[in-house]
Amino acid sequence: MGRGVLEPVQERGRAALERLGLPTRREEAWRLTDLKRLEAIARLPLSSSAAEATIPPAAAGALRLVLDGQRDPLHGVDLPEGLTPLTLPELEQALGHTLDQCGCSDSWPVELNHASASHVLALRVRGTVPPLELVSTAEAGLTATRVLLLLEEKAELELMQVLLANGAASAHSHVLELHLGQEAQLRHGLLASADGDASLMAHVAVEQEPRSHFSFTSVVEGWGFGRVEPRVVQVDGQAHTRLKGLAVASSQQQLATHTAVRFDGPDGELDQLQKCIAGDRSHTIFNGAISVPRDAQRTNAAQLSRNLLLSDRARVD
């Protein structure tokens, strides 16, 4: 879905990558990054075939969609009541809006996805719907996937994402935009697992309206290079955000988690816990930014980071 809509996005993304070049350590967000690994991702050709992976059956009652960057994930699928594809005008209006709201539409990983993704899964959620499972697999080359979910007022969704990859010459670029209407509830799980050498860059942009609840739990392990970036904005405050993350690194892997939460209104809540386990010569990074401007009175934000070093040669920042 969205090939026609994404063509100008791809052109703008490619132009942006040429203009920006690769990030440098002079930029605070990339100061600790192994830029050689980033350069290796930039050199990868786009994956030319859909990867095949052996995965267990979907949970009972859940809807599983496969995102491989090559095919329309909705082809031949009957969606349950409450889940509908966005129309073309709706997609043109909504695509990229949450990225803009979160201030990350022109970041390098997002521009890489803009330049590379040829399909977008765009769904509207009404009421309470069955659990949704999105499975993405990557093998040789760069696999780029993009998802847009609009939760209407009082909608409820349980979303599980599984990102898999094999081989040092494979990388996964993923961008997810989420808009939660008033009193909407989203429980979001992300499991990203690889064979030890592949690369991952995942951006999760979330826009919350008042009295909405967003709970995000992520587990990242096995990637030679991994960068996960959840970014949340509570547009008028009065919303609840819960972020729980675990990064497990070994060998010479580098796993980074960069989060940003902004409160644009009063009475917002944040509960965040990030855990890292680092062994061998691995390196884990956590950077959590919280923005509470003057209008965000009575904000209650809690953030904790816990680390476990399994080797005296491992590093945590």
What is each residue range found by the language model?
Residues 1-145, 152-154, 163, 309, ...:
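N-terminal leader/transition segments
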Residues 90-317:
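Conserved beta-strand/loop scaffold segments within soluble protein domains that form the structured core
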